[in-house]
Amino acid sequence: MMSRTESRYSSQRTWLLSMVVLAALWSISVQRATARVINDDCPNLIGNRDLYKRVEWICEDCSNIFRNTGMATLCRKNCFFNEDFLWCVYATERTEEMSQLRQWVGILGAGRE
């Protein structure tokens, strides 16, 4: 027969294990959903995450300059292949990097429909 202390310890351990499993499952589902959204925008993202981060940084800077949270989303639309991205390049004064940025956007968007 189990004592009261052993029973309480067993239930606490079961509860803790349940919470750890639920947290792990939630984390995995969030990561998959985030990756799916990013992959839908840029089909050639796998293996090019460093390029994506460099190009995305322009959109984040642009959003911070104008204090408009929707600006970053517009800038990233169609895997950075849009007028808003070009506008952000000019707004962040990175026109000297334009040829490099076009090359990176081309790599990220390769296979785009």
Curated annotation (Swiss-Prot):
* Family assignment from sequence similarity: Belongs to the arthropod CHH/MIH/GIH/VIH hormone family.
Query: Main localization of the protein?
Result: secreted
Name the lineage: Eukaryota, Metazoa, Ecdysozoa, Arthropoda, Crustacea
Which residue windows are coiled coil? none
- One GO cellular component term noted in the UniProt record for this chain: extracellular region
Q: Where is the signal peptide?
A: 1-35
This protein's species is Metacarcinus magister
What name does UniProt use for this protein? Molt-inhibiting hormone
Q: Which PROSITE patterns match?
A: CHH_MIH_GIH
| Alphabetized GO MF terms | neuropeptide hormone activity
For whether the record's keyword set contains Iron-sulfur, the answer is: no
Q: Relate the protein's function as given in its record.
A: Inhibits Y-organs where molting hormone (ecdysteroid) is secreted. A molting cycle is initiated when MIH secretion diminishes or stops.
Gene Ontology biological-process annotations: circadian rhythm; neuropeptide signaling pathway
Q: Where in the cell is it found?
A: Secreted
Q: Which cysteines are joined by disulfide bonds?
A: 42-79, 59-75, 62-88
For this UniProt record, the keywords arranged alphabetically read as follows:
Disulfide bond, Hormone, Neuropeptide, Secreted, Signal
